[in-house]
């Protein structure tokens, strides 16, 4: 994001600021205007020309979000130790369910299948 800020500062500094007269203002017919976007007091907006194989235009960027995303990309990742139970054989006892049940599940019971009833 620093490159974009530096680039925009350089470009905007190169533009000379002169008082414009009526002769300097481009005369654009009202039918040719597509739209107007007022930035108001927003100072965290940057725009860049964008072009690829299928489209071209202006890309509007929220610099605050872009800087936060860049900081997240630059953080280093560290490995952490996996905490796992020691390996052991699976012990099945008569009447014991194979898997843990949900916290709010019904109590364990034998599966009862009736004719025409779906399994689940």
Swiss-Prot record:
GO BP annotations of the record are: mating; pheromone-dependent signal transduction involved in conjugation with cellular fusion
UniProt keyword list: Cleavage on pair of basic residues, Pheromone, Repeat, Signal
What the protein does comes down to: The active factor is excreted into the culture medium by haploid cells of the alpha mating type and acts on cells of the opposite mating type (type A). It mediates the conjugation process between the two types by inhibiting the initiation of DNA synthesis in type a cells and synchronizing them with type alpha.
Put simply, this protein is called: Mating factor alpha-2
Instruction: State the coiled-coil residue ranges.
Output: none
* Annotated GO MF terms: cupric ion binding; mating pheromone activity
**What cellular component GO annotations does this protein have?**
extracellular region; fungal-type vacuole
| Signal peptide as annotated in the record | 1-21
Which residues form the pro-region? 22-86, 102-107
Transcription regulation found in the keyword field: no
């Amino acid at each position: 994001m620093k490159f974009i800020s530096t680039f925009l500062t350089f470009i905007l500094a190169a533009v000379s600021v002169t008082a414009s007269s009526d002769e300097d203002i481009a005369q654009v017919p009202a039918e040719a205007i597509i739209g107007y976007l007022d930035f108001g007091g927003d100072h965290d907006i940057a725009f860049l020309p964008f072009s690829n194989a299928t489209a071209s235009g202006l890309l509007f960027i929220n610099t605050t979000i872009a800087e936060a995303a860049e900081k997240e990309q630059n953080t280093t990742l560290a490995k952490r130790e996996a905490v796992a139970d020691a390996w052991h054989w699976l012990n099945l006892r008569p009447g014991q369910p194979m898997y843990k049940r949900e916290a709010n599940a019904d109590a364990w019971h034998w599966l009862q299948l009736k004719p025409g009833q779906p399994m689940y």
